[in-house]
Amino acid sequence: MGKLTILVLVAAVLLSTQVMVQGDADQPADRDAVPRDDNPGGTSGKLMNVLIRSGCPWHPWCG
């Protein structure tokens, strides 16, 4: 009976260390992450940035 108890304790320790090393694979920060908007103005904002940088020939568009 003593050997069985030791065997169960060793198995429990090995399983707990495996869980600690591997993690639980459920990362709520990664799963619920919202993609960063690199272009907050959208396509029109990107177009305006290009036009302003290139010396926009259409003054009503360039503001």
Curated annotation (Swiss-Prot):
The modification D-tryptophan is found at W58. Pfam families: Conotoxin. The lineage of its organism: Eukaryota, Metazoa, Spiralia, Lophotrochozoa, Mollusca. Residues 1-23 form the signal peptide. Exists in two forms, due to cis-trans isomerization at 56-Cys-hydroxyPro-57. The cis conformation is the major form. Disulfide bonds join C56-C62. Its target is unknown, but this toxin may modulate voltage-activated calcium channels (Cav) or calcium-dependent potassium channels (KCa). Residues 28-39 have a biased composition (Basic and acidic residues). Residues 24-46 are annotated as: Disordered. Belongs to the O2 superfamily. Contryphan family. This is Contryphan-Eb. It comes from Conus ebraeus (Hebrew cone).
